[in-house]
């Protein structure tokens, strides 16, 4: 396993995931009968401050259809959590207008790179171009100074 599982933290994430799904109107319990489902959800709400007991609730009451989706969500959240600890693995998001994103995406695909790699290449290209322009300007200035002195 690449990332360490932290039971307390992940139980809290699972509780949050289940509550969010419940608020969105999804059936989070395996019960068809409304009263049993409401009782199970009420019990889950009480477990907010006891994250480890959430696992037992999941075993007893959770809708089995949610199992894989919840595992994937928790796995992704665990990855983001541990990646956020190190500067080089921390992810940031930026807002792009759709046409800009579309052009960047097409360029990335042509180059066979990720969006991040393509952005880095574009920045490096711009920096090299700027450095070259500065060198040419300096050479031009020096040449004008040399030619200007001889006259």
From Swiss-Prot:
GO terms of molecular function: sequence-specific DNA binding
Subcellular location: Cytoplasm
Pfam families per UniProt: MatP, MatP_C
InterPro entries (alphabetical): Arc_rbn_hlx_hlx, MatP, MatP_C, MatP_N, MatP_N_sf
Quaternary structure, from the entry: Homodimer.
Homology family: Belongs to the MatP family.
Name of the protein this chain belongs to: Macrodomain Ter protein
Gene source species: Photorhabdus laumondii subsp. laumondii (strain DSM 15139 / CIP 105565 / TT01)
């Amino acid at each position: 396993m690449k990332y360490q599982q932290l039971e307390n933290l992940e139980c809290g994430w699972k509780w949050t995931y289940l509550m969010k799904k419940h608020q969105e109107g999804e059936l989070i319990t395996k019960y068809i009968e409304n009263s049993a489902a409401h009782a199970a959800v009420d019990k889950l709400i009480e477990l907010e401050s006891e994250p480890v007991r959430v696992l037992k609730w999941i075993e007893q009451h959770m809708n089995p259809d949610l199992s894989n989706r919840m595992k994937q969500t928790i796995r992704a959240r665990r990855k983001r959590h541990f990646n956020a600890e190190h500067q080089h693995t921390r992810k940031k998001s930026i807002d792009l207008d759709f046409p800009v994103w579309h052009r960047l995406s097409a360029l990335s695909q042509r180059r066979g790179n990720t969006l991040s790699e393509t952005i880095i290449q574009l920045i490096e290209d711009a920096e090299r171009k700027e450095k070259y322009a500065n060198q040419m300007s300096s050479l031009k200035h020096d040449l004008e100074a040399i030619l200007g002195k001889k006259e």
